[in-house]
Amino acid sequence: MADDLGDEWWENQPTGAGSSPEASDGEGEGDTEVMQQETVPVPVPSEKTKQPKECFLIQPKERKENTTKTRKRRKKKITDVLAKSEPKPGLPEDLQKLMKDYYSSRRLVIELEELNLPDSCFLKANDLTHSLSSYLKEICPKWVKLRKNHSEKKSVLMLIICSSAVRALELIRSMTAFRGDGKVIKLFAKHIKVQAQVKLLEKRVVHLGVGTPGRIKELVKQGGLNLSPLKFLVFDWNWRDQKLRRMMDIPEIRKEVFELLEMGVLSLCKSESLKLGLF
């Protein structure tokens, strides 16, 4: 026992055995914290968190707002207007108003006053109860006498202006009861050249002409049709096409009508040798 106690017993202890328990405890805690930091797995972002949150969320809303705005600002269609109110027959005031609107940006104020037509140059308008034959009989009761006295070529006694060639053929078929033995000429561009119509007007006497304003204007311009003997100019005013448009609702037709009126029609109306009718 004495020999054992005499030895330097602390030298034989293993390394770290002499350290205080407090020190060992502190070092152990530090090591565990480092190990925990190294071993804790870093959370991997999921597929949902990788995608930006604002993607494709705002743009569809803006598109919906834009579509609603354009719907609010859209122009009224003719079908919308007709659905709310019954169609009204055309009146001379309607033609006068269209003329003022058309020439307001092209003429001076003094010149616009010269375009005003007296009420005496207008015939009774169609009240939407007439067929074409019955309307023509009402506005021209002495047609047979006029037809017999007409012998001048390159001219007609009555012009009926419509919007298309198809409509012109319909009008020609519907006026059989009125025209009698009167000669009718088709005045439109479909399948008929201008020169062929000029030669036809030069060869024979014609009483009635039915066609589009563009072709009639071209014939007058080329000297194939003389408007001086003309007594009646009737507009196919109230008829509507598949899009429910009247002839004066179509910009191209409206422009050609006013250009034709300037080629001597207005002066004939003011001299009271020509009457205007709205069918």
UniProtKB/Swiss-Prot annotation:
The keyword Protein biosynthesis does not apply. The modification Phosphoserine is found at residues 19, 24. Transmembrane segments: none annotated. Keywords: Methylation, Phosphoprotein. The keyword Phosphoprotein applies. InterPro entries: Cms1, P-loop_NTPase. Residues 1-10 have a biased composition (Acidic residues). Residues 1-89 are annotated as: Disordered. The modification Phosphothreonine is found at residue 212. GO terms for molecular function: RNA binding. This is Protein CMSS1. It comes from Homo sapiens (Human). The gene is CMSS1.
